[in-house]
Amino acid sequence: ALSYSKGMGRLEFQFLNIGRKLKLRLGAKGIYPFGDAEEDDPAFFVYLKAEISYKSGSGKLVPFLNYNGGYDLNSFTSFSLENPYVAPTLAIKATEVNHYGDLGLKAYPGSGLSLKFNAHYSQSDNFPLFKRLPYDDNNQDVAYRLSNAYEVVYDSVEKMGIVTQIEMRFSEYNKISLETGYYEYKRKGDQKVWNLPSLKIDLNANFRLGKKIFFQASGHYIGDRDSVKNIPVSLIENSSGNYQTIESVGSVFSIASSITWKINDQWDLFYEGNMILSDNTSRWAYYQNQSQLHLGGIRYKFDINL
């Protein structure tokens, strides 16, 4: 059964200075967690906050630094939204984000083009990692004990990476952006970090053709990631009935698109499609999604005044 009841009190202050070139925001926040799931001696957490940016004379180059921390109250809902296959037997803890910082540069060359490049570093205690549960020989037909669900393991995790973003804005309705993030993870004791991809790519595009046709498209790529694999063995060989090893789960590449034709103020003709183009169709090992989904139809918007 779930064991969780928690809240927190929060106090925050900040100093803001906005100049023509230099923008400076400094502050801090204090958090006091409470609840029957808290330790016997709960602590008071203080996190600093800093946002600094500086515009060059032309305004086309803006170096920036963002730094903060936080105390994230996890829940079964938040875990299940990220991983719908978590078992309903989680010991839920809050995540202490001790450091979260980005240092980089924004560039605006002109003609609607903008670039962003930054280095990222974060360090968290009680960072949630999803680990595949083994097959339980004494499961008594309990659904989530058939090696088909995930538990949450908490540990200290460092995250380091490089993020690049390019955006081209042609007009108010026409733009395209591409963001790429490459990350390295470090866990206490040099243990494996499960189900976290080192490479993520996101593509988004919006276009309006004339005054009646709207087109949207997006693409998402997540790279390979490590996952726990449980191999059933005889109870004589292993008392748990499982042998645990690490496997690599293949990358996933998906695209989504939609086209809307506005016939008039109330009637729309539309098409929506989702396609997964990789051999692996799910972020989670041994779960697969439909590789293609297509929907088309006509939409009527009611004008109801109460």
Predicted regions and their residues:
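Exposed, low-structure sequence patches enriched in small/polar residues
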Residues: 21-23, 27-306
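Outer-membrane beta-barrel transmembrane domain signature of Gram-negative proteins
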Residues: 1-20
